């Protein structure tokens, strides 16, 4: 019997492309490879800014795979390409800002036993059993952003706080969410995802019980190799 495989959605393509690019940058940065350190320094300048404002970043944010057509998939339309490119720009520049001066990888993939979505990351900034209203308000403000440009600015503010606390994030998952955000009804979908992530923030041990907030995280110290 032949098993039919569902075609890869545009959002999945954005997420996978972001994951591959960010993982490569992170490996290079943590290995102190000069090209990766320089690339992240350039990308940081784009955090919170629109993709078209910094043409010199186009070579760093390679969207070429989006113009290809995987087996069983259809070519992306012009409107899909524009939204995908904008989502990748925001996600990669936010990752570059997040990773600055960190000795451990700030990008970690979200998993059922280790949530690393935006909501979970914000929740991890709070003490267990307490809701920090000031921090929570930042998530709410991001969720009510009127457009992608404002959302990028508000996410930038959140990422600065996450970096300060050494809290990881799945920036590739975020890239897919940013793609979805730009479509009618997409903001509602992403807000629901962030809300679920916020309430499922605990890491889980092998027996399924919640682990302590810091059990999975190796605390890092600052490095000045890219302090600019």
Language model regions located:
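Alpha-helical oligomerization segments
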Residues: 163-228
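Non-catalytic, well-ordered alpha-helical scaffold segments
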Residues: 37, 41, 59, 82-93, ...
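Conserved binding-pocket/active-site segment within a compact domain
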Residues: 106, 111-180
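N-terminal interaction modules that seed assembly of large macromolecular complexes
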Residues: 23-90
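Aromatic- and glycine-enriched beta-alpha-beta binding-site module
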Residues: 66-121
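Short, extreme N-terminal leader segments that mark the start of a protein/domain
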Residues: 1-33
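Helix-boundary capping/turn motifs
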Residues: 14, 32-35, 52-56, 84, ...
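Amphipathic alpha-helical interaction surfaces
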Residues: 49, 53, 67, 71, ...
């Amino acid at each position: 019997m032949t098993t039919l495989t569902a075609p890869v959605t545009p959002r999945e393509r954005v997420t996978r492309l972001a994951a591959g690019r960010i993982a490569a940058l992170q490996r290079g940065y943590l290995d102190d490879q000069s090209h990766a350190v320089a690339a992240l320094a350039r990308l940081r300048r784009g955090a919170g800014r629109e993709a078209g404002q910094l043409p010199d970043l186009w070579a760093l944010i390679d969207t070429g795979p989006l113009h290809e057509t995987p087996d069983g998939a259809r070519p992306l339309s012009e409107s899909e390409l524009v939204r995908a490119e904008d989502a990748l720009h925001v996600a990669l520049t936010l990752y570059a800002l997040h990773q600055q001066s960190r000795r451990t990888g700030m990008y970690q993939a979200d998993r059922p036993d280790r949530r690393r979505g935006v909501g979970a990351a914000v929740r991890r900034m709070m003490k267990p059993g307490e809701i920090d209203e000031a921090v929570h308000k930042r998530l709410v403000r991001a969720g009510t952003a009127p457009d992608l440009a404002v959302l990028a600015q508000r996410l930038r503010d959140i990422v600065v706080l996450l970096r300060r606390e050494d809290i990881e994030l799945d920036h590739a998952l975020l890239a897919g969410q940013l793609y979805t955000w730009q479509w009618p009804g997409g903001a509602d979908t992403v807000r629901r995802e962030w809300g679920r992530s916020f309430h499922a923030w605990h890491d889980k041990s092998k027996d399924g019980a919640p682990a302590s907030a810091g059990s999975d995280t190796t605390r890092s110290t600052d490095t000045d190799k890219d302090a600019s």
